[in-house]
């Protein structure tokens, strides 16, 4: 598969989970069933019952970042012990205070690079250290997280100097994200803050000054990373309600959101199905349905692991087959935006600057390289809008 992708000029980014493993992992099984003798016990954070008060197991250090969510778990077959698992009992956290874990995970990344993958989406990148409310935002934790990602990057660059790394740093406060991009740690992070803002802008039909805020963030991250930071834009992902559902089925609003993030700087990530308006609301199985290739429930290569109930409630219109020949479809809206992005250098690689039309119903900005500038203006409303363009403000 890798050879075929590379032959077509496609780079392959693999999802790599380094914060935790599955509870069926041989390391964890050995550690939790033989906690006194296992060489893997220190690969995890496992405590004896004598080290904590089971009757008062609700103090601040037992709360996850999201509030009253327990991070300590118990294994049914090993009473008298508990282990750290921020994402639940089935996903025990690895212990990065143990240098052996660093070595193991760097080896894992290098293994896949040697197989030919071009980079990694780094799952739960902010949770390597600091899963407690009372420590997660301290300078010490920020420094430890940054140091690990610098170490990891260095290890990956030994195999592939051009490796692409993007971190899942789910943090709305951009100041708290700075350590992750500082001095060559993670040069790419998913922009969760921007994603939420773009959905709000599209749905409310008001720009809310988001371009000015975005430029400030780019300046901040650019300075911290010595100019190496690249944004990674998206609308929703596999852990969130799908864009079309967030928009309550309003196709115009969903198209507006696409028009915004596909004309902004950065590496764009499209969650499959978004390009045809696939709906989906939590729980997870409803936002991870099969790709709707066909109008019917049958077709070559179509998985049947889960009936696409959101898809088929729309009569098959939410499919590639139904939309591919419709010039006004969501699919062709995405295709047109992506063709612009590929053909117009300023849209693909250019910087961004605010262009204020004075109309809150218009989102406008300049994309520019040294030899090209493009004015992007998106009408957020359902009505015709007239704006005046001043040549001296367009960097042209």
Residue map of PLM features:
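Acidic/aromatic-lined carbohydrate-recognition and catalytic surfaces
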Residues: 1-106, 110, 114, 127-181
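Core domains of carbohydrate- and sulfate-ester-processing enzymes
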Residues: 29-85, 197-223, 288-316
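Short, well-ordered coil/turn segments that N-cap beta-strands
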Residues: 6-10, 116-118, 160-163, 186, ...
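Loop/helix patches that line or flank the sugar-binding groove of alpha-linked glycan CAZymes
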Residues: 153-159, 171, 180-181, 197, ...
């Amino acid at each position: 598969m890798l050879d075929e992708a590379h032959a077509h000029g496609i780079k392959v980014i693999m999802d790599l989970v380094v914060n935790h493993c599955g509870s069926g992992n041989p390391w964890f099984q050995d550690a939790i069933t033989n906690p006194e003798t296992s060489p893997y016990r220190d690969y995890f954070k496992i405590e004896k019952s004598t080290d904590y008060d089971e009757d008062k197991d609700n103090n601040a250090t037992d709360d996850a970042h999201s509030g009253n969510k327990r991070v300590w778990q118990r294994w049914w077959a090993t009473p008298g012990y508990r282990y750290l698992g921020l994402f639940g009992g089935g996903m025990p956290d690895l212990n990065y205070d143990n240098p052996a874990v660093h070595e193991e995970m760097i080896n894992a990344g290098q293994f896949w690079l040697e197989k030919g993958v071009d980079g990694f989406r780094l799952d739960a990148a902010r949770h390597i250290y600091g899963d407690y409310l009372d420590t997660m935002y301290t300078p010490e934790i920020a420094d430890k997280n940054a140091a690990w990602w610098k170490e990891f990057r260095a290890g990956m660059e030994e195999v592939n100097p051009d490796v692409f790394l993007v971190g899942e740093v789910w943090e709305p406060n951009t100041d708290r994200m700075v350590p992750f991009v500082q001095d060559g740690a993670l040069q790419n992070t998913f922009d969760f803050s921007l994603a939420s803002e773009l959905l709000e802008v599209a749905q409310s039909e008001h720009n809310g000054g988001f371009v000015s805020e975005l430029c400030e963030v780019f300046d901040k991250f650019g300075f911290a990373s010595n100019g190496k930071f690249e944004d990674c834009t998206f609308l929703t992902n596999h852990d969130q309600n799908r864009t079309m559902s967030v928009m309550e089925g309003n196709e115009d609003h969903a198209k507006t959101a696409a028009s915004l993030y596909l004309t902004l700087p950065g590496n764009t990530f499209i969650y499959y199905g978004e390009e045809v308006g696939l709906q989906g609301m939590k729980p997870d199985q409803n936002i991870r349905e099969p790709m709707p290739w066909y109008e019917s429930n049958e077709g070559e290569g179509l998985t049947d692991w889960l009936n696409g109930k959101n898809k088929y409630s729309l009569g098959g219109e939410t499919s590639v087959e139904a939309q591919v020949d419709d010039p006004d479809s969501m699919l062709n809206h995405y295709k047109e935006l992506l063709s612009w992005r590929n053909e117009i250098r300023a849209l693909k690689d250019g910087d961004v600057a605010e262009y204020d039309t004075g109309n809150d119903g218009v989102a406008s900005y300049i994309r520019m390289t040294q030899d090209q500038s493009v004015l992007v203006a998106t009408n957020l409303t359902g009505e015709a809008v007239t704006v005046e363009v001043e040549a001296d403000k367009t960097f042209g």
